Curated annotation (Swiss-Prot):
Part of the ABC transporter complex PstSACB involved in phosphate import. Responsible for energy coupling to the transport system. It is a peripheral membrane protein. Its main location: membrane. One of its GO terms (cellular component) is plasma membrane. Belongs to the ABC transporter superfamily. Phosphate importer (TC 3.A.1.7) family. It catalyses: phosphate(out) + ATP + H2O = ADP + 2 phosphate(in) + H(+). Gene3D superfamilies: P-loop containing nucleotide triphosphate hydrolases. The gene is pstB. Residues 12-251 form the ABC transporter domain. The complex is composed of two ATP-binding proteins (PstB), two transmembrane proteins (PstC and PstA) and a solute-binding protein (PstS). This is Phosphate import ATP-binding protein PstB. It comes from Prochlorococcus marinus (strain NATL2A). ATP binds at G44, P45, S46, G47, C48, G49, K50, S51.
Amino acid sequence: MNKKNIKTTSSVSLDNVSIRYGNSVAVKNVFCDIEKNQVTSFIGPSGCGKSTVIRAINRMNDLIEGCKLSGSVIFEGIDIYAEDIDPVEVRRRIGMVFQQPNPFPKSIYENIAFGARVNGYKGNMDQLVEESLTKAAVWDECKDKLNESGYSLSGGQQQRLCIARTIAIEPDVILMDEPCSALDPLSTLKIEETIHELKKNFTIIIVTHNMQQANRVSDYTAFFNTEKKDKDLGGKIGFLVEFDKTKNMFNSPKQKSTQDYISGKFG
């Protein structure tokens, strides 16, 4: 990824980002600066574009036929959609943890080692595996069964294994798309505790429908909503309503729709 002459103090900046699928606009005109080593939550009702936006930050949407982005996504001063940028390298630097735990059909050890090996890691693999699992708060539960399948773990443990797998390739940013939605409350608490520790070393962006979770784990919050498209087209378009420090948004939101959403009046 070659440096461009784009100045930013943020880890990731979205500059007038709009995303469409074919002729249908999914989300429009998003401006937002994601601060380094902070947790930013994306909240909003279903269909508002928050998952579409988070997947644009590491070019996962490139894999969807007909998906087009306008505007700029700037990462560490680089326009990641510039022609000379390798999307594979973008995805290494900006990792993703998905909604459903998706360990590889390999041993716990190989779930960590495989990606690191593919990305050319030449260091002490045993140490990397231990450090990654420790940072994801799952080492104590895995250390005596590293050769067992990743599928042998509980759902919450599998999700922390997936976080450890992401950590092992040494990204700068970790994206989490509703990482706790399929988990029980105790497993959710473990993930949230892990997020608090991870922000010491990583910038984290999390999509969540859980307002209490957004309030607990994030430093900043972006609230997305929808508006109706042209009546002849049908459907809705997502847009960013408000972006602020989480404590400000939850205590004194600037927009009435933000207040209505976080208080449970719609969503």
